[in-house]
Amino acid sequence: MDTIKRRYSDAELEEFRAIVLGRLETAKADYAETMKVLTNQDTNDVDDTSPTYKALEEGSSSQTKEELVHMAMRQQKFIQGLQAALLRIDNKTYGIDRITGELIPKERLRAVPHATLSVQSKQNYKDH
């Protein structure tokens, strides 16, 4: 009789841990870089404080800053998702679909390591 696999093995979880940690490191670096740009930590010039610059670039600058804030928020959410994935790995619940309780395919977890739903569950969830 076949037994249904209810969780990934410890070796598989360690493989996923390496993937998650790699993505987390990159995400944190990207977030830090975005925050540097937002807070002008990399510049020593006065170009963005001169009245001429402000008059000409106010709209563009405002839009760019809004986009950067949005990017930073998305990156922060991604980091939180990856940190939650690490907790699920520690708890040995990583890769289990939160709706069906079945294992999420490895291919999906490699592509989206913070996933908590299989593609099918996600589509069904959106339809409701």
Task: Give the predicted meaning of each segment.
Residues 1-88, 128:
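Interaction interfaces in information-processing and related assembly proteins
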Residues 62, 95-98:
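Short, flexible micro-motifs
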Residues 89-95:
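Glycine-centered tight-turn and secondary-structure capping sites
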Residues 97-100, 118:
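Short cysteine-rich clusters marking metal-coordination/redox-active sites
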Residues 104, 125:
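Cys/His-rich microdomains that often coordinate metals
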Residues 107-112:
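Short Cys/His-rich "knuckle" micro-motifs
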Residues 113-123:
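Cysteine-rich micro-motifs
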